[in-house]
Amino acid sequence: MTRRRCSLAKNTTGWWISSDGSGRLSDHFRRDIGQRELGSGDVRIRVEYSALNYKDALALTGKPGVLRSTPLIPGIDAAGVVEESSDPEFPAGSRVVLTGFGYGEHRHGGLATTLLAEGKHLITIPETLTTREAAAVGTAGFTASLAVAALLKHQLRPDTSPLPVAVSGAAGAVGSFAVFLLASLGFSVTAITGRTDEADYLTFLGATTVMSRQEVLSLPERALLPEEFSGVLDQAGGTLLARLIASTARSGVVAASGLAGGSDLPTTVMPFILRGVTLVGVDSVYQPLEVRKELWADMASRKFPWDEMIRDIALADAHTVAPHVLAGITRGRVVVAVGP
């Protein structure tokens, strides 16, 4: 049976990114986004909160490589309340969260007061999470949870792994969740950061040791370095990831989920064929719903220190804060208050 598409409602307020004939991107804060500009979907969501992710910051600052089409509303995360639906699983009044599936990249995303989505892409927000907290988890928390699950899947355990697990970009969004999750599971965690002034924050989250990013980057450019880590959760890519792979112990596991430090990987096969190191890629965009539901249930059971992890901003301020996200100077999670 074909589902009825959602009807039109009042105008939407949000960020609108367009492109000129040369491909140059520009962003506008609009209060008059017409409903016919929102596309289609079988669930209409009144967005209450979104978050400012690295991809969103790239889009808002006109950087190429994220948006697959324009004009577009950015925002790869959205949390809010269903206003109208033809999907019986998500009746009006349901609280839902959306991450990935190309929203904010090739179809309109969550940095606007209304979002038209497909029910098959939605997750019901667990009762233990507020809508704001669900947005805080969003892509960042889900990515960290996937990375931790990858380590566990490859038999990395705190009781059999005497060496710590390294987390790069530890003071950022994904890194903060990763440090907390690993510590709560009993792992010893080495938090790697470019901002050692956040040492108290990282220790509060559960890090055993805080290490400067420059210290890792200054390690010799060798195929194999002394075995320092049983596992790695990396958000940086580039030279930093290469040094961490070279420092991973025998049978260790490295989960890579970002490229804030570069998309290249200047390493060799030596760690993989001489130490049996496993490199796992973490894709948070197109994970099946079964995986999403399982990990969201797990995240909802955790007692995250939200007051320490969240920075709240207004929707109109997203463009101003975006360069700070790209520069890596925001701590924890930037949550965007979108609507009432």
What spans do the regions from the language model cover?
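Residue-level marker of beta-strand positions
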Residues: D77, S94-R95, T114, S184, ...
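N-terminal Rossmann-like NAD(P) cofactor-binding module of classical short-chain dehydrogenase/reductase
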Residues: V97, S230-L233, A255
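Mid-domain Rossmann-like dinucleotide-binding core that forms the NAD(H)/NADP(H) cofactor-binding site
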Residues: A135-R213
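Glycine-rich phosphate-binding loop and adjacent beta-alpha segment
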Residues: T239-F304, G339-P340
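C-terminal hydrophobic helical "lid"/dimerization subdomain
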Residues: K10, R292-P340
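Glycine-rich beta-strand-centered segment in the early N-terminal region that forms part
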Residues: R36-A51, K63-Y103
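NAD(P)H dinucleotide-binding glycine-rich loop of Rossmann-like/cofactor-binding domains
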Residues: T99-V165
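Short amphipathic alpha-helix with an adjacent loop that forms part of the alpha/beta core around
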Residues: V216-E227
